[in-house]
């Protein structure tokens, strides 16, 4: 048998480039040995950006096939319809505090250590023995009542919405806000317990009755409870950090407690309340950035301003009623270093400045 001289012709498929091979796509840092799949805010990406940006993708970014998870009887993922506010790019928001999982524990740990050291030194030096009875009563009733407001906001406002926002950057900032509130409420509870053990003149149970039935605190309690019933996460954030905290929170903490404590021989309370004030300064920074982004949005800015105006019309009157109802507690301490009118004017001036920064109209109720 002889082999055929002719060799069989072989055919090969035509090579087609689909741009799926390595190195085909150009993106930031694509020619570097290390790369990122997003554009950093500055020249180099930060740790915060690396662990938060696009960790929660959506159909507008990367999920071309749509949401890959969701409830069986509901929308998939994190719908933007969970708020009436609109944005042309929710992913443009970055937390100016650059908070992420590690910083929550690191920063809160420092504050907890500071509070524990302050309280242990106070007990060792027996500083509570020098406090007058009216001041002990003021702390037990009013600072104790404020503990309930902080705890309510922590558990039923910020914790409830920290997975409702459309991007991981907003959700992380809200989660940190919840951790701040929760820790501050626990600090106030620890302070209450220490005072109860240190002196017989301090009623460590008075705060519960005050929060539930004292006339001066009922409007504040009503606002907090109304906030917990709001389904729109953006309105919750607006009503809490923009309106309630400005007109009621800073009025009580900054413009009363921090102003009169030293005059009543108390250098412990300002240390503890000051941690809550520092937390709110950081929380207000991210809140201001978020709502400034929404009011300056090229597509939805004007509609958002109109929406926020309706929210102001709802929450400003309620918070003003709560603030004015607190007026009697300004006369309770023995040393009255500041009047309610002075404190109220300072709080409303800060609120006006914040609204002007956001480009919102000043509510007429502030001039009444």
Swiss-Prot record:
Catalytic activity, EC: 1.14.13.227
Keyword NAD recorded: yes
Reaction it catalyzes: propane + NADH + O2 + H(+) = propan-2-ol + NAD(+) + H2O
Keywords, alphabetical: Monooxygenase, NAD, Oxidoreductase
Keyword Oxidoreductase (UniProt): yes
Coiled coil stretches, renumbered: none
Superkingdom: Bacteria
InterPro entries (alphabetical): Ferritin-like_SF, MP_mOase_hydro, Phenol_Hydrox, RNR-like
Signal peptide annotation: none
Induction cue: By propane.
UniProt-recorded Gene Ontology molecular function terms: oxidoreductase activity, acting on paired donors, with incorporation or reduction of molecular oxygen, NAD(P)H as one donor, and incorporation of one atom of oxygen
Enzyme class name: oxidoreductase
Assembly description: The propane 2-monooxygenase multicomponent enzyme system is composed of an electron transfer component and a monooxygenase component interacting with the effector protein PrmD. The electron transfer component is composed of a reductase (PrmB), and the monooxygenase component is formed by a large subunit (PrmA) and a small subunit (PrmC). Probably requires the presence of the chaperonin-like protein PrmG to ensure a productive folding, resulting of a soluble PrmC, which leads to the active form of PrmABCD.
Described purpose of this protein according to its UniProt entry: Component of the propane 2-monooxygenase multicomponent enzyme system which is involved in the degradation of propane via the O2-dependent hydroxylation of propane. Also able to catalyze the oxidation the water contaminant N-nitrosodimethylamine (NDMA).
Family from the record: Belongs to the TmoE/XamoE family.
Protein name, as recorded: Propane 2-monooxygenase, hydroxylase component small subunit
């Amino acid at each position: 048998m002889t082999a055929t001289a002719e060799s069989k012709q072989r055919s090969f498929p035509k090579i087609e480039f689909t741009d799926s091979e390595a190195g085909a796509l150009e993106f930031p840092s694509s020619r570097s040995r290390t790369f990122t799949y997003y554009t950093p805010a500055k020249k180099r990406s930060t740790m915060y950006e690396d662990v938060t940006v696009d960790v929660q993708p959506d159909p507008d970014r990367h999920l071309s096939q749509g949401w890959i998870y969701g409830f069986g009887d509901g929308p998939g993922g994190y719908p933007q319809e969970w708020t009436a506010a609109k944005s042309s790019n929710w992913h443009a928001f970055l937390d100016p505090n650059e908070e992420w999982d590690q910083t929550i524990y690191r920063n809160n740990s420092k504050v907890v250590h500071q509070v524990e050291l302050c309280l242990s030194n106070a007990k060792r030096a027996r500083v509570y023995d020098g406090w007058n009875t009216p001041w002990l009563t003021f702390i037990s009733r009013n600072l104790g009542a404020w503990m309930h407001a902080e705890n309510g906001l922590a558990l039923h406002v910020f914790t409830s919405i920290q997975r409702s926002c459309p991007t991981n950057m907003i959700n992380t900032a809200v989660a940190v806000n919840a951790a701040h509130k929760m820790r501050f409420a626990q600090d106030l509870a620890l302070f209450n317990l220490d005072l109860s053990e240190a002196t017989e003149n301090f009623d460590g149970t008075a705060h519960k009755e005050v929060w539930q039935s004292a006339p001066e605190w009922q409007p504040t309690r009503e606002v907090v409870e109304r906030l917990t019933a709001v389904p729109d996460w953006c309105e919750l954030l607006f009503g809490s950090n923009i309106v309630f905290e400005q007109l009621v929170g800073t009025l009580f903490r900054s413009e009363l407690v921090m102003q009169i404590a030293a005059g009543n021989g108390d250098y412990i309370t300002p240390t503890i309340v000051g941690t809550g004030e520092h937390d709110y300064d950081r929380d207000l920074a991210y809140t201001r950035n978020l709502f400034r982004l929404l009011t300056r949005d090229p597509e939805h800015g004007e509609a958002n301003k109109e929406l926020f105006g309706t929210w102001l019309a709802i929450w400003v009157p309620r918070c003003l009623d709560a603030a004015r109802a607190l007026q009697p507690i300004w006369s309770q301490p023995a040393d009255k270093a500041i009047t309610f009118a002075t404190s109220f004017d300072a709080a409303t001036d800060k609120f006006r400045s914040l609204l002007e920064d956001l480009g919102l109209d000043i509510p007429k109720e502030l001039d009444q």
